[in-house]
């Protein structure tokens, strides 16, 4: 949601999820230095063949040529995608939003001196309640609560940077114009007073309608209806001191030992299940570069995943 709101600014374009570090940088040993044209071409063609890139709403053919011309290093690869996105939308300034990049904010700050890091935080109980409904997310409360904790811990590593800014989701939806003005001031821009965020605006990015529609408070504290008291106690136990640190009040109920043991069992089941489901990905990842056509890999991966229906383990939820 924040990405789409900021991208309404006439000078700023925030690119969708590139997953640069997971899909590209971690595999740099397989592709080699990008100042070699053959290495660069192989990486560009493989990356641009993924569905994720097409969801960015860009001219993929033009992006390919731009990457071949300019992406002579891994930092330049990501920068080229961001710059192409802003040029494509006739904007002057660029940015990118991938949640997993919260673990890499220090690397990004070193690559791009003067970069701004906007750390968006939300009530962990609402985050977990939302993740429980996502097909791609873990099915256990324990694992989803740790996702919130680890992602925020990663982003906190750059709080000493001048470019770091903490934004609270609840304040953003309560006073969107005021928060957007604060963000713009932080990055050296001014939020146009005539620009309203009250109305729904179309977006070039493919993402759930909840993230693309008008700003609403309807999703605040949904956890009260969607999580059981024991699940809430688990989330608060894992969130720990960060719950109060970010301004959220505890529900006041401690998780019992039996609740923790049960949650760990469910989390363990889910972890093993996900490892099995992801076996094709791990194989493909560790055998790069490979001559296997990408469409054949995706065909096999989908068939493999269909063998494991998306379902929680028996009695997987804490009552």
Where are the regions that the model predicts?
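Charge-dense, low-complexity intrinsically disordered segments
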Residues: 65-72, 138, 142, 170, ...
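A conserved segment at the C-terminal end of the G1
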Residues: 1-12
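PAPS-dependent sulfotransferases, especially Golgi type II membrane carbohydrate sulfotransferases
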Residues: 27, 156, 189-319
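PAPS-dependent sulfation machinery
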Residues: 13-96, 101
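PAPS-dependent sulfotransferase catalytic domain
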Residues: 27-29, 82-214
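Glycine-rich, histidine-containing beta strand-loop boundary motifs that form or position
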Residues: 4, 16-18, 119-122
């Amino acid at each position: 949601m924040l990405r789409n709101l900021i991208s309404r600014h006439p000078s700023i374009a925030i690119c969708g999820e590139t997953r640069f570090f997971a899909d590209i940088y971690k595999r740099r040993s397989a592709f080699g230095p990008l100042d070699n044209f053959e290495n660069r071409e192989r990486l560009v063609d493989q990356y641009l063949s993924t569905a994720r890139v097409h969801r960015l709403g860009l001219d993929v053919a033009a992006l390919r040529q731009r990457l071949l011309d300019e992406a002579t290093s891994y930092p330049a690869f990501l920068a080229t995608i961001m710059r192409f996105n802003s040029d494509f939308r006739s904007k002057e300034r660029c940015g990118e939003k991938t949640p997993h990049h919260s673990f890499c904010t220090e690397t990004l700050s070193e690559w791009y001196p003067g970069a701004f890091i906007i750390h968006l935080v939300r009530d962990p109980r609402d985050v977990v309640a939302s993740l429980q409904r996502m097909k791609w997310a873990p099915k256990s409360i324990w694992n989803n609560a740790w996702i919130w904790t680890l992602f925020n811990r990663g982003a906190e590593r750059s709080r000493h940077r001048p470019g770091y800014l903490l934004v609270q989701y609840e304040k953003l939806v309560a006073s969107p114009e005021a928060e957007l003005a604060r963000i713009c001031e932080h990055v050296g821009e001014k939020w146009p007073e005539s620009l309203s965020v009250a109305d729904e605006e179309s977006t070039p990015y493919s993402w759930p309608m909840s993230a693309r529609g008008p700003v609403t408070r309807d999703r605040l504290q949904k956890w009260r209806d969607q999580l059981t008291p024991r699940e809430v106690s688990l989330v608060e136990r894992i969130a720990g001191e960060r719950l109060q640190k970010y301004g959220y009040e505890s529900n006041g109920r401690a998780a019992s030992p039996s609740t923790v043991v049960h949650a760990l069992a469910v989390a363990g089941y889910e972890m093993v299940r996900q490892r099995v489901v992801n076996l094709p990905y791990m194989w493909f990842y560790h055998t790069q570069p490979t001559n296997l056509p990408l469409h054949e890999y995706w065909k096999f991966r989908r068939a493999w995943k269909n063998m494991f229906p998306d379902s929680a383990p028996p009695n997987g939820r804490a009552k």
